[in-house]
């Protein structure tokens, strides 16, 4: 289906100001049309569908009641922001979502005044909203002005400690601040579900008696699935020794639960809060992820992240796979190893599917732990599992491991505990852009004493590295691998345990050595082929380890070649810097060795395809070829420059 939906009312909305002249009934119609437009757009671009569909009515209500952009609506994670972008002057570009030079899939300050605070990681919204509230009261100035600050945060994000740190501070300061808890019951599952005991208590204190009266029947007004969710939470509250909810004990006035899809409930509550709130308020709205689009509602992940799809059937249009994904290779290999070793267990932070641990969880649920959005806790939990004699694999995206870095240092590395870090989404990741790039883990992991750091050049190497990590008990060990499909190499039947700190020579050559760390090896080999056509035959090597370095191999490469170039999918300070330190310590530079290190540039690279992103970073085969020609001084003058990115 290619026809766009008919949206006569939505067509009249150029900015949120246009919503204010509409009746409540018309706002409800706008919400209906906005939902259809969101589905249509994401069917073309792919992206986070379910989250946006769950907040359509809330988005319309917020922008119609509050005075954005003076009032700051801060979307936690912000993957639910597509309807928000449509209403805030970006509808004409909505079908460029997550594409090169298109709209970001998240809120972004540089994109619109209606995006006051960028996001993509979870649980930051309340801290940001509190900051805006304090800035307002201290006389801070922005171009749009400073009014109310409204944080919209999901139940999953509320499982992170940062959200409660912010609420604790907000309650102490007592500033006028509005938090909307978007409870779609998707993320608070039994393993991380203690918080769910607090998610339903009607507000009982002045000055909101009118709200209490309005909300008294709210549970009975909810659709059956929501009534059950509210009942579940209220039942769990009965045994509490102290009165009031957790939110009230933190200093927040609590309103709810209300049906987050019912404009007749949303609009009066928001209008009353806007008119009368004096301190921090939490509004508990119960919603349904994927609301209004049956294929998303019935999907296992409620349409959390989709490829392009057919609007009628919901069938996703995924390109045929030529090789297994790195994530699936990790998950399958770990599960197979767990069958042989009962001490192997796994920890992830709200990403069992994304990290491939769903395979392990299905077969060994008692040894697989989803700790929720709690990377700090997850790392320390894994550290103590290791101290207790288990073999924990802590599987996290590179970008999210950053959130638990102090624990990596303090609880794992200093104690030399054998935690195995499986670092997924290493390097540039494509459509999710800079916020999800795994650019820094080589540097921040390899700088830690006693940490072993590996990078897989292909899916077969990853299989070996999982086995190597399982066999290594002398201290912490990490291995990194990218998003997406492998290289299509032949997979070994059984993994091999690699010798720690030993790389491999792929192709013997002369004059220049290309030393790759990670999956740039494929591009290095393409560059070597192009160079061979010019009469230059480089040596190609796969380092495998950034720490400990293969000292013998690196010094041999330096001795036998006039130039040595390292290539890695990481920021400066990583593998190449460690190689340079070794060469410096051994006085190799004194002999005249020409050394270059190809790393990601010192900038944040916006979303595009991975190939386009690596082109922008000057890290693809033609750039490697140009670097060799330049360092050897054999390029013509017009070939000395790197290809335009």
Swiss-Prot record:
InterPro entries: Dxylulose-5-P_synthase, THDP-binding, Transketo_C/PFOR_II, Transketolase-like_Pyr-bd, Transketolase_BS, Transketolase_C, Transketolase_CS. It catalyses: D-glyceraldehyde 3-phosphate + pyruvate + H(+) = 1-deoxy-D-xylulose 5-phosphate + CO2. SMART domains: Transket_pyr. The keyword Transferase applies. Its cofactor is Mg(2+); thiamine diphosphate. Pfam families: DXP_synthase_N, Transket_pyr, Transketolase_C. Binds 1 Mg(2+) ion per subunit. Its EC number is 2.2.1.7. Pathway: Metabolic intermediate biosynthesis; 1-deoxy-D-xylulose 5-phosphate biosynthesis; 1-deoxy-D-xylulose 5-phosphate from D-glyceraldehyde 3-phosphate and pyruvate: step 1/1. GO terms for biological process: 1-deoxy-D-xylulose 5-phosphate biosynthetic process; glyceraldehyde-3-phosphate metabolic process; terpenoid biosynthetic process; thiamine biosynthetic process. Mg(2+) binds at residues 155, 184. GO terms for molecular function: 1-deoxy-D-xylulose-5-phosphate synthase activity; magnesium ion binding; thiamine pyrophosphate binding. Keywords: Isoprene biosynthesis, Magnesium, Metal-binding, Thiamine biosynthesis, Thiamine pyrophosphate, Transferase. Thiamine diphosphate binds at residues 79, 120-122, 156-157, 184, 293, 375. CDD domains: TPP_DXS, TPP_PYR_DXS_TK_like. NCBIfam families: dxs, PRK05444.2-2. Catalyzes the acyloin condensation reaction between C atoms 2 and 3 of pyruvate and glyceraldehyde 3-phosphate to yield 1-deoxy-D-xylulose-5-phosphate (DXP). Homodimer. Belongs to the transketolase family. DXPS subfamily. PANTHER family: 1-D-DEOXYXYLULOSE 5-PHOSPHATE SYNTHASE-RELATED (PTHR43322), 1-DEOXY-D-XYLULOSE-5-PHOSPHATE SYNTHASE, CHLOROPLASTIC (PTHR43322:SF5). HAMAP family: DXP_synth (MF_00315). This is 1-deoxy-D-xylulose-5-phosphate synthase. It comes from Ruegeria sp. (strain TM1040) (Silicibacter sp.).
């Amino acid at each position: 289906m290619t026809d766009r939906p008919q949206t006569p009312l939505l067509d009249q909305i150029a900015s949120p100001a246009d919503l204010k002249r509409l009746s409540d009934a018309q706002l409800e119609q706008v919400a209906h049309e906005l939902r259809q437009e969101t589905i249509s757009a994401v069917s073309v671009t792919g992206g986070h569908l379910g989250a946006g569909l769950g907040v359509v009515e809330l988005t319309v209500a917020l922008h119609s009641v509050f005075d954005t952009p003076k009032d700051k609506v801060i979307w936690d994670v912000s993957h639910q922001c597509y309807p928000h972008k449509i209403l805030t002057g970006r509808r004409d570009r909505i079908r460029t979502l997550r594409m090169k030079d298109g709209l970001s899939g998240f809120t972004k300050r540089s994109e619109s005044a209606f995006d006051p605070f960028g996001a993509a990681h979870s649980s930051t919204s309340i801290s940001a909203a509190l900051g805006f509230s304090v800035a307002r009261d201290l006389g801070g100035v922005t171009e749009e002005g400073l009014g109310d600050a409204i944080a919209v945060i999901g139940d999953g994000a509320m499982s992170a400690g940062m959200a409660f740190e912010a609420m604790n501070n907000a309650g102490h300061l007592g500033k006028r601040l509005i938090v909307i808890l978007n409870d779609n019951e998707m993320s608070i599952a039994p393993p991380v579900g203690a918080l769910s005991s607090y998610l339903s208590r009607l507000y009982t204190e002045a000055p909101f008696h009118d709200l209490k009266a309005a909300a008294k029947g709210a549970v009975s007004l909810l659709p059956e699935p929501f009534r059950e969710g509210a009942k579940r939470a209220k039942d769990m509250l009965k045994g509490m020794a102290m009165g009031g909810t957790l939110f009230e004990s933190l200093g927040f006035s609590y309103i709810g639960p209300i049906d987050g899809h019912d404009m007749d409930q949303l609009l009066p509550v928001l209008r009353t809060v806007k008119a009368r709130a004096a301190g921090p308020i939490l509004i508990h709205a119960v919603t349904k992820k994927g609301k209004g689009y049956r294929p998303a509602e019935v999907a296992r992940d409620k349409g959390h992240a989709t490829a392009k799809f057919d609007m009628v059937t919901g069938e996703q249009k995924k390109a045929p796979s030529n090789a297994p994904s790195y994530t699936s290779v990790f998950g399958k290999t770990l599960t197979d190893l767990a069958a042989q070793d009962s001490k192997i267990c796994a920890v992830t932070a709200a990403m069992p599917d994304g990290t491939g641990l769903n395979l392990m969880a299905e077969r060994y649920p008692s040894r697989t732990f989803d700790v929720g959005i709690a990377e700090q806790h997850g790392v320390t939990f894994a550290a103590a599992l290791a101290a207790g004699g288990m073999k924990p694999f802590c599987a996290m995206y590179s970008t999210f491991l950053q959130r638990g870095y102090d624990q990596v240092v303090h609880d794992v590395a200093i104690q030399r505990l054998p935690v195995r870090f499986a670092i997924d989404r290493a390097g540039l990741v494509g459509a999710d852009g800079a916020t999800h790039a795994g650019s820094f883990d080589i540097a921040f992991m390899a700088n830690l004493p006693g940490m072993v750091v590996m990078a897989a050049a292909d899916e077969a190497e990853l299989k070996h590295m999982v086995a190597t990590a399982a066999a290594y008990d002398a201290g912490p060990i990490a291995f990194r691998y990218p998003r997406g499909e492998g290289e299509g190499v032949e997979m070994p039947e059984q993994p091999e345990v690699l010798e720690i700190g030993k790389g491999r020579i792929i192709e013997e050559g002369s004059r220049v050595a290309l030393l790759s760390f990670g999956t740039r090896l494929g591009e290095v080999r393409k560059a070597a082929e192009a160079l061979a056509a010019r009469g230059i035959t480089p040596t190609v090597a796969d380092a495998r380890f950034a720490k400990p370095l293969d000292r013998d191999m690196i010094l041999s490469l330096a001795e036998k070649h006039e130039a040595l170039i390292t290539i890695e999918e990481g920021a400066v300070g990583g593998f190449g810097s460690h190689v340079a330190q070794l060469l410096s310590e051994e006085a190799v530079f004194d002999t005249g060795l020409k050394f270059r290190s190809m790393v990601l540039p010192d900038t944040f690279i916006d979303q595009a395809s991975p190939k386009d992103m690596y082109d922008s970073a000057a890290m693809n085969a033609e750039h490697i070829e140009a670097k060799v020609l330049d360092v050897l001084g054999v390029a013509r003058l017009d070939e000395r420059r790197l290809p335009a990115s």
